[in-house]
Amino acid sequence: MNSVLGNQTDVAGLFLVNSSEALERAVRCCTQASVVTDDGFAEGGPDERSLYIMRVVQIAVMCVLSLTVVFGIFFLGCNLLIKSEGMINFLVKDRRPSKEVEAVVVGPY
């Protein structure tokens, strides 16, 4: 019985070693550099033109987002400025002149 148990652990150890080696072989086999097309030529990563197009699209998207943020902040600031001017005008209309102001205004007449 001990010999059977010992054999099972040895087999399990060999399986683990072989599985890690098999995994390494599979990873090395399936890299992007080793992909072969129908013509038989190995195709590398993305070509230079597609990288250029991706970069231009990224720059365009970042410009649009930046302009959106800048104009959003600008219009928010303008809106707050208009509201604050309206509040100031509202407060000025509700203020009552003091008695000293009336005395000064009435005095020269």
From Swiss-Prot:
Known function: May be involved in the regulation of p53-dependent G2 arrest of the cell cycle. Seems to induce cell cycle arrest by inhibiting CDK1 activity and nuclear translocation of the CDC2 cyclin B1 complex.
Keywords, in A-Z order: Cytoplasm, Glycoprotein, Membrane, Phosphoprotein, Transmembrane, Transmembrane helix
Membrane topology, as annotated: Single-pass membrane protein
Chain positions carrying an annotated carbohydrate: N7, N18
The protein's name: Protein reprimo
Record lineage: Eukaryota, Metazoa, Chordata, Craniata, Vertebrata
InterPro entries named in the record: Reprimo_fam (IPR043383)
Domain of life assignment: Eukaryota
